[in-house]
């Protein structure tokens, strides 16, 4: 009798140690424009801080952090609405405005969020591999030790949700168990948590603008980078819904500091919503003209 093979073995080992990484298509005009905006934002932020009287080190640090925030806003917008590139460009511009008005926070939560979204929507066209899992668990552990205990909690929930979505990977359950174990190592801050009314207003705007994208996800035609297969609309909607729950929850339970960290992600959602709104207005104008 032939030896029974593991049907998950091929997809688990094929393609190296990372499956959630995605390349950038520099042939796309909007992608090139977004990269230019990222680079210019660093220069503009550095000069603005210098003219404000900051030291050269503080100015350079602010410039690099601003560029990182703009970059993640663009990347996260691509995960929330992979079919339309314009949303990412708008998100980058909104992120610059946020950086100048609100300041910049820690980019580690943004890196974690980016990989959580890719874990769920599978825009890369591949399942998570050992490298992705190590990165996500390390980020969850580090953020948990910083007092942000919700990150390992949401990491575990995301892995379990991934296993239940179409073409879910059964080993996600194991990773979810590891993530929940990290909750025991997380620090819980004893300081009172406050969140400003401005951040609550901002969350309301994000929620309203992202709702059309969740509806449009049913009609996605985006194909995974590696397998060139249309991604599951349910997976895309799961990522979008998780984005709302995660970003709102960490801001609510961890306060204004975490809301600042989430502001580039919210810029990504606003860019997606504004892109869809612009497309709807253009379509309505075209129909009226006909």
Task: Please give the residue ranges for each predicted region.
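N-terminal topogenic module of multi-pass integral membrane proteins
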Residues: 1-131, 142, 238-290
């Amino acid at each position: 009798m032939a030896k029974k093979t593991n049907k998950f073995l091929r997809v688990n080992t094929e393609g190296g140690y990372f499956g959630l990484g995605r390349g950038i298509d520099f042939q796309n005009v909007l992608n090139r424009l977004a990269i230019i905006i990222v680079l210019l934002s660093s220069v503009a932020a550095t000069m603005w801080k210098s003219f404000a009287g900051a030291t050269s080190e503080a100015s350079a640090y602010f410039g690099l952090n601003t560029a990182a925030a703009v970059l993640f806003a663009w990347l996260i917008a691509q995960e929330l609405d992979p079919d339309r590139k314009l949303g990412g460009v708008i998100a980058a511009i909104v992120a610059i405005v946020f950086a100048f008005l609100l300041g910049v926070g820690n980019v580690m939560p943004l890196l974690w969020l980016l990989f959580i979204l890719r874990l769920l929507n599978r825009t890369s066209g591949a399942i998570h591999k050992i490298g992705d899992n190590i990165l996500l668990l390390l980020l969850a552990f580090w953020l948990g030790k910083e007092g942000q205990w919700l990150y390992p909690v949401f990491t575990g929930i995301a892995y379990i949700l991934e296993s239940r979505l179409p073409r879910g990977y059964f080993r996600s359950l194991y990773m979810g168990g590891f993530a929940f174990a990290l909750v025991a190592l997380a620090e819980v801050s004893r300081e009172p948590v406050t969140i400003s009314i401005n951040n609550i207003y901002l969350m309301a705007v994000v929620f309203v603008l992202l709702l059309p994208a969740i509806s449009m996800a049913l009609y996605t035609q985006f194909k995974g980078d590696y397998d060139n297969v249309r991604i599951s609309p349910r997976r895309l909607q799961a990522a979008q819904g998780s984005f709302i729950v995660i970003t709102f929850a960490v801001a609510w339970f961890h306060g204004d500091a975490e809301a600042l960290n989430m502001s580039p992600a919210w810029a990504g959602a606003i860019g997606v919503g504004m892109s869809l709104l612009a497309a709807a207005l253009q379509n309505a104008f075209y129909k009226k003209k006909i």
